[in-house]
């Protein structure tokens, strides 16, 4: 009963804010930014936010966040930041001319005050897996709710894409007018060529496995022998940094074993894009990060240990896996170690294929994506 009452109060409150958003005039020089439900300061929104703060003082840029630790960090950097759904956040949102997000307005900011503002959807990367409407078209129930509660409709003004190939997928996935999709490149990729932050003489690889929603998956189930892997990496002079999804975390016993390794590092990077250039090669299975890593023209090793199961149990892919993954495919840790060694001996082995796929999915590689996105936003305000 309390849950129903709370939902009704939220709806009434939302209706009031939605009506106010019709009345209160928007200020085109106030832009609000958010990312990943307010829990992270990362991704495309972060990089555009910092670009605007640095280069366009005429714009009042504000970050909206749920995480109070992040708020403190940003305040210490002299950024303007408010807690999501706080009175200050709602009041400034009612006046903001641009809502800039990485996931969607409801999650990253607040959907209620967004009427008459320009919604800029930066998204969070080129999709290999099918997304949004391409996965599940809206049900009649969802359509009815959006009709009854019009503020639930996210009317995107600009959706940024990295290439014309990516734009084709976004048209169907978002169900959006193609004219609203702008090929600008992703703001986060402007920092890919930044100076290295992890300094060591040894070679370094970053391993980014994808979370499986429909079934349990553990990368260490596929012929992983701790001592063999440790010795092999030592002999090659290679460190592997593995970022696991929280739900894929190994048990405590296995984590203790991994913590004794000198060459395997389980890490949690808040913003992987700020350090991608530090690594000599990337290991992944289905993570769309590799589309960005292509810009560095470094080796990529694909480790789809459970490829057949993934394709049958998880979301469909937009492409034939082998046609858009320019690099060797490892079926287990034994093959993965062999491919790491091969990539160190012949780093240019797949370079032509890397360039082919890079050019298909990335139109720009000039570190001016933020500038292009900024110009597109200004054009519609």
Question: Residue spans of the language-model regions?
Answer:
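A nucleotide-sugar donor-handling region in carbohydrate enzymes
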Residues: 3-17, 128-221, 246, 345, ...
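A donor-sugar binding/catalytic signature common to diverse glycosyltransferases
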Residues: 99-130, 269-314
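C-terminal alpha-helical cap of glycosyltransferases
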Residues: 366-381
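Catalytic binding pocket for nucleotide-activated donors in carbohydrate/polymer assembly enzymes
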Residues: 288-361
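Donor nucleotide-activated moiety binding/catalytic core segment of transferases
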Residues: 81-98, 246-291, 324
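Extended catalytic core of nucleotide-activated donor transferases of GT-like folds
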Residues: 46, 78-142
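Conserved catalytic-core segment of nucleotide-activated headgroup transferases in glycan assembly
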Residues: 42-50, 54-56, 181-183, 187-256, ...
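N-terminal pre-catalytic "stem/leader" segment of glycosyltransferase-like enzymes
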Residues: 1-90
């Amino acid at each position: 009963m309390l849950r129903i009452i709370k939902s009704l109060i939220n709806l009434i409150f939302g209706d009031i804010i939605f009506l106010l958003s019709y009345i209160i005039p928007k200020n085109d020089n106030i832009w609000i930014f958010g990312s990943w439900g307010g829990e992270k300061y990362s991704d495309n929104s972060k990089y555009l936010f910092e670009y605007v703060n640095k280069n366009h003082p005429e714009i009042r840029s504000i970050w909206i966040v749920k995480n109070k630790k992040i708020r403190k960090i940003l305040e210490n950097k002299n950024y303007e930041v408010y807690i999501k759904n706080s009175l200050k956040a709602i009041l400034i949102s009612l006046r903001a001319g641009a809502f800039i997000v990485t996931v969607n307005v409801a999650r990253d900011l607040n959907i209620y005050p967004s009427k008459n503002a320009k919604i800029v959807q930066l998204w969070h990367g080129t999709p290999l897996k099918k997304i949004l409407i391409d996965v599940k078209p809206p049900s009649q129930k969802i359509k009815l709710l959006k009709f009854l509660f019009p503020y639930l409709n996210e009317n995107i003004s600009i959706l940024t894409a990295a290439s014309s190939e990516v734009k084709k997928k976004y048209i169907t996935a978002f169900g959006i007018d193609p004219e609203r999709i702008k090929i600008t490149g992703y703001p986060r990729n402007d920092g890919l060529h930044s100076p290295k932050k992890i300094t060591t003489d040894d070679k370094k690889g970053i391993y980014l496995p994808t979370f499986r929603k429909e079934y349990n998956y553990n990368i260490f189930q596929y012929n992983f022998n701790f001592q063999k892997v440790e010795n092999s990496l030592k002999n090659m002079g290679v460190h592997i940094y593995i970022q696991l999804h929280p739900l894929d975390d190994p048990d405590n016993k296995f984590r203790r074993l991994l913590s004794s390794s000198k060459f395997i590092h389980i890490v949690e990077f808040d913003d992987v894009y700020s350090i991608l250039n530090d690594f000599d090669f990337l290991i992944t299975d289905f993570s769309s990060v590799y589309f960005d890593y292509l810009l560095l023209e470094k080796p990529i090793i694909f480790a789809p240990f459970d490829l057949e199961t993934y394709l049958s149990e998880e979301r469909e892919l937009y492409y034939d896996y082998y046609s858009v993954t320019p690099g060797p495919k490892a079926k287990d840790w034994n093959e993965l170690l062999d491919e790491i060694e091969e990539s160190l001996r012949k780093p240019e082995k797949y370079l032509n294929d890397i360039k082919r796929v890079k050019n298909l999915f990335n139109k720009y590689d000039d570190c001016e994506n933020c500038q292009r996105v900024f110009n597109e936003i200004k054009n519609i305000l």
